[in-house]
Amino acid sequence: AHGLPGVARRFSRNGINLDGLDTWLPGLSLSILTQVAHDLHCAEAFATQLPLGCVVTHEDVTPQFKALALWAKAKGIPTVHIPHANHFIKTRPDVHDKCVCDWIFATSPWMADWYAERGFPRERIKLTGCPNWDVWHEVVQTISKEHARAVMLLEQDRPVVLYCTSWSQSTNLVDDHTVKDRADVAVLEAAKQAGWQLVIKMHPGEPPDWQKRYAEMAKERGVPALVTQSHLTLSVRAADVLVSVGPSNVIVEAALGDRPSVVVPLRGYGFPCEPPWLADPTPEAIQAAVGRVLDNPQLWTEERGRFVQRFAWVHDGGATRRAAEAVREVGKWQ
């Protein structure tokens, strides 16, 4: 903790007010270092029992995974980053600009270009698709809209809007952390005005007790709503349109499930073209955007293939197989 008050003052002189830094940074640093030390000790123990041919991470910018990748590289073990989603970040700098692994197995052409533009060698980027999205290939063949609505006790003949909540991004310095809260209210008001059936699918990272929060918000506004933190596949297949905040990759999963999306964008993030269709965090804007998609289904029918190819590459359920084969190619095996 020595010297931290001085560090805080230097930050403040540069326009970042971090008074009190010394009250929380030492404890946070200690907790991170303890976890990293534990993980690397486990990795060392594992490596003494079995030869390691490759280390694979789903991201390499947070302390634990970055440390693991650096540890492997120091030992000459090939490292692979399989991003768990696309990055829709336009603003730089951003924490995701750097990748420490030897290889990137990209989710999509968009993701491959994104990393290449930030200086990662293109010859070390392999297109595989996103393994955790393979399930959607089977979902669209086995779960119909009618079945999903029956399971979720939704009316068959009234529009269903799926609202996927998000979290305020914190990987760069341009985000507007008020958008998410404004969007929560705007979607509820739009659903009330338009008479939609509303399903609220919580972000996996939100506290589970927020399910009660969303339910109470809907009740206060007189909006019948089904709130869940699970059942994404059923929710997508039951919906006519998905509404999301910011750069969430749930819009790509919705596309794999053959459902269009309206996005309330966060500052600093964006898409090259429609879809998705964008809306400000107001009831009027959201109602207009969703209404346009509902009234013109050909907008989605005509663009779905290009959207999926751009952000998910090949929709065949084979990303896991391709990633495993690529790991076999780049690893060092005895």
State what each model feature region is:
Residues 53-56, 103, 160, 197, ...:
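Structural motif
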Residues 1-135, 251:
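Active-site and donor-binding regions of nucleotide-sugar-utilizing enzymes
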Residues 315-334:
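C-terminal alpha-helical cap of glycosyltransferases
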Residues 131-216:
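Conserved catalytic-core segment of nucleotide-activated headgroup transferases in glycan assembly
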